[in-house]
Amino acid sequence: MNKIIVFETTRLFLRQYKDEDFSALHSIFSEEETMRYYPAPFSMSKTYDWIERNQSRYKSDGFGLWAVCLKETGQLIGDYGLVKQTIDGRIEVEVGYHTNKRFWSKGFATEAALACKASKYCRP
């Protein structure tokens, strides 16, 4: 899969997940504090499934969670985007994001949210 940039901000670019993102994503998803609102941190298997599920969503839904990368270095620092959830028997679209703990409190999630809001990719 090629590096497909979905949209950019001053400091970030958001792109589709690649299989090579596993290590960076697993370091985020296996961190207990980051995953405190999930039943448990992700195993390696769950992280692989997460990548595959979002790659499928790009094709089926036209959106999903995208890799959030620093423009300056290309480093993946988290993900951000839209996902479908079933709530009370209805399919709803929600905003989701995860950020590597080292990058908390730097405004990256807000920056990604504002760019997403202005993007055609955040209009399901």
Where are these regions (language model features)?
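GNAT-family acyltransferases
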Residues: 1-102, 115-119, 123
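Glycine-rich acyl-CoA binding loop
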Residues: 105-110
